[in-house]
């Protein structure tokens, strides 16, 4: 029984299957953690969702910003962009089933036995574990409810960007969603900066990566995140693991075997990397919420 953690898949099914074959993944015995952004940019978003769903309880995943964007597109709230390559998913006969499964997935995973926390973008320095759990549950509750289109319509926006327990309603949900799925940089007080998408060494002062600020999360817990492909998994402190290594941009799909902290990688298949890089958008470009 092994625990495997994999970074953002972005519709790259062939690379995912090749990577799982490297470690002889057995869904009957092993557990697979996924950092979110299962869909968009790669060629096989539909088949990725079908495959991950078929794994049932063997999977512990979180939603990423591209997954939320897919939900918004399917609900008629956001526009389907050709570069996301999700039209086959939207037109699939089982699209309703897949979308309803996807919107019931969590935005946060916490395992108290393994001392593991996973969120697509990370954990804001303004939250401790209990606050993160509470805010994640609130987002998950509205996503799984019949009123989820109202939330999806309101989630786009960068404000508020400063946590307060006094936040309520859609403003509170938007902050939580941004913190869990879009965050990269923070100001020294922990306030989110939703504009800069550069590498840490090129970010303007006083911005710092969220993981370089003092955190309220119990240091016994390790934090797993994806989302930030340009990091290439490097430059993070001990106990923080960035697993998005840009497979859909021609980089790697990365797996971390938690039992012995050993990394495995699968290089992107060249043809797909060329398609994305020739479409005129930068590696790691994010969906704008």
Swiss-Prot record:
**What are the transmembrane regions?**
none
Q: Which GO terms describe its biological process?
A: RNA decapping
Q: Which domain of life is it from?
A: Bacteria
Q: Reaction catalysed by this chain?
A: P(1),P(4)-bis(5'-adenosyl) tetraphosphate + H2O = 2 ADP + 2 H(+)
The molecular function GO annotations come to:
bis(5'-nucleosyl)-tetraphosphatase (symmetrical) activity; phosphatase activity
Q: What is its EC number?
A: 3.6.1.41
Which InterPro entries did the record assign? ApaH, Calcineurin-like_PHP_ApaH, Metallo-depent_PP-like
Q: Give the UniProt entry's GO cellular component terms.
A: cytoplasm
> Which Pfam families does the UniProt entry name for this protein?
Metallophos
- What are the entry keywords? Hydrolase
Q: Is-annotated flag, keyword Ribosomal protein?
A: no
Give the record's family classification: Belongs to the Ap4A hydrolase family.
Which HAMAP family does the record match to this protein? ApaH (MF_00199)
Main role? Hydrolyzes diadenosine 5',5'''-P1,P4-tetraphosphate to yield ADP.
Protein name listed in UniProt: Bis(5'-nucleosyl)-tetraphosphatase, symmetrical
Specify the species.
Yersinia pestis
Provide the organism lineage as a comma list. Bacteria, Pseudomonadati, Pseudomonadota, Gammaproteobacteria, Enterobacterales
Instruction: Name the gene for this chain.
Output: apaH
């Amino acid at each position: 029984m092994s625990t495997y953690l994999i970074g953002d898949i972005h519709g790259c099914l062939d690379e995912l299957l090749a990577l799982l074959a490297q470690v002889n993944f057995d869904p009957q015995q092993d557990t697979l953690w996924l950092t979110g952004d299962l869909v968009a940019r790669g060629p096989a978003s539909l088949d990725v969702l079908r495959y991950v769903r078929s794994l049932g309880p063997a999977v512990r995943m979180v939603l990423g910003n591209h997954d939320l964007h897919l939900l918004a597109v399917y609900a008629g709230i956001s526009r389907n962009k050709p570069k996301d390559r999700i039209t086959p998913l939207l037109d699939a006969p089982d699209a309703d089933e897949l979308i309803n499964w996807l919107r019931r997935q969590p935005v946060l995973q916490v395992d108290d036995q393994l001392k593991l926390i996973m969120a697509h973008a990370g954990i804001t320095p303004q939250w401790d574990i209990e606050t993160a759990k509470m805010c994640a549950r609130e987002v998950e509750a509205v996503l799984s409810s019949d009123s989820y289109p109202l939330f999806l319509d309101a989630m786009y926006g960068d404000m508020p960007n400063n946590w307060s327990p006094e936040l309520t309603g859609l403003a509170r949900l938007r902050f939580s969603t941004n913190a869990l799925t879009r965050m990269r940089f923070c100001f020294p007080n922990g306030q989110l900066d939703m504009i800069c998408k550069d590498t840490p060494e090129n970010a303007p002062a006083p911005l710092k990566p969220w993981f370089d600020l003092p955190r309220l999360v119990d240091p016994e817990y390790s934090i797993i995140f994806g989302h930030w492909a340009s990091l290439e998994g490097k430059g993070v402190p001990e106990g923080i693991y960035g697993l998005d290594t840009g497979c859909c941009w021609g980089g790697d799909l990365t797996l971390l075997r938690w039992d012995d902290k050993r990394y495995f990688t699968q290089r992107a298949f060249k043809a797909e990397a060329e398609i994305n890089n020739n479409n005129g958008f930068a590696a790691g470009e994010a969906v704008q919420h």
